[in-house]
Amino acid sequence: MDSLNLNKHISGQFNAELESIRTQVMTMGGMVEQQLSDAITAMHNQDSDLAKRVIEGDKNVNMMEVAIDEACVRIIAKRQPTASDLRLVMVISKTIAELERIGDVADKICRTALEKFSQQHQPLLVSLESLGRHTIQMLHDVLDAFARMDIDEAVRIYREDKKVDQEYEGIVRQLMTYMMEDSRTIPSVLTALFCARSIERIGDRCQNICEFIFYYVKGQDFRHVGGDELDKLLAGKDSDK
């Protein structure tokens, strides 16, 4: 995290506080990544015990989000950070909200798997497992980019979401074909479509975290910007830290 310039602060305690919440974010991110990986495995393998552990573990993710948010509030109230320090605290608060929502997706996947899926649905789950692994890799990579505030890696990950969208669209077409060929599959296909959409949204959450990295490094709000306009903004000079 050299790019965060934590050593510039006169207050060693302020350094420690910033480093602490950054470390907590990475811990929470690792927890969410494991939850998501376990959820995809539980769904694909119809592992009810693993699914139950993921559901139980979601409360730990929620508790961590609250604890980090409270730490951010304390820093703002006590230190009154400015410029890049304030951006960092804001980015951390927004990032943990995205991570918590990804944790919710893992929870929902497991609940759905327990209630709706059985071994007879295995053909429907193969493509969902592939999409899930794709988004897990995106999450892993964006957490790594966040740790280093690596804008080049964030740009690559941001663009990776297009591939996730394409994979999702292919799954939708495949599932619709199942429904048209056999109307008895309609309930299970609708459930699979719900899961596919939930997994696809993880890619969007990772994109949001990329935007937070852009904001921290560049000092500009990149939300709702895409294509050529995004390229132009990212090509600009880095903001003053």
Curated annotation (Swiss-Prot):
One of its GO terms (biological process) is cellular response to heat. InterPro entries: P_transport_PhoU (IPR028366), PhoU-like_sf (IPR038078), PhoU_dom (IPR026022). Disruption phenotype: Produces high level of alkaline phosphatase (AP) when grown with excess phosphate. No effect on phosphate uptake, but particular deletion mutants have a severe growth defect, which is largely alleviated by a compensatory mutation in the pstSCAB genes or in the phoRB operon. Accumulates high levels of polyP, approximately 400 nmol of phosphate residues/mg of protein. Higher susceptibility to a diverse range of antibiotics including ampicillin, norfloxacin and gentamicin, and stresses such as starvation, acid pH, heat, peroxide, weak acids and energy inhibitors, especially in stationary phase. Keywords: Cytoplasm, Pharmaceutical, Phosphate transport, Transport. The keyword Ribonucleoprotein does not apply. Induction: Expressed at higher levels under excess phosphate culture conditions. Induced by phosphate starvation via the PhoR/PhoB two-component regulatory system. The keyword Cytoplasm applies. It is found in: Cytoplasm. GO terms for cellular component: cytoplasm. GO terms for molecular function: magnesium ion binding; manganese ion binding; protein homodimerization activity. SUPFAM superfamilies: PhoU-like. Belongs to the PhoU family. Homodimer. Part of the phosphate (Pho) regulon, which plays a key role in phosphate homeostasis. Encoded together with proteins of the phosphate-specific transport (Pst) system in the polycistronic pstSCAB-phoU operon. PhoU is essential for the repression of the Pho regulon at high phosphate conditions. In this role, it may bind, possibly as a chaperone, to PhoR, PhoB or a PhoR-PhoB complex to promote dephosphorylation of phospho-PhoB, or inhibit formation of the PhoR-PhoB transitory complex. Is also part of complex networks important for bacterial virulence, tolerance to antibiotics and stress response. This is Phosphate-specific transport system accessory protein PhoU. It comes from Escherichia coli (strain K12). The lineage of its organism: Bacteria, Pseudomonadati, Pseudomonadota, Gammaproteobacteria, Enterobacterales. The gene is phoU.
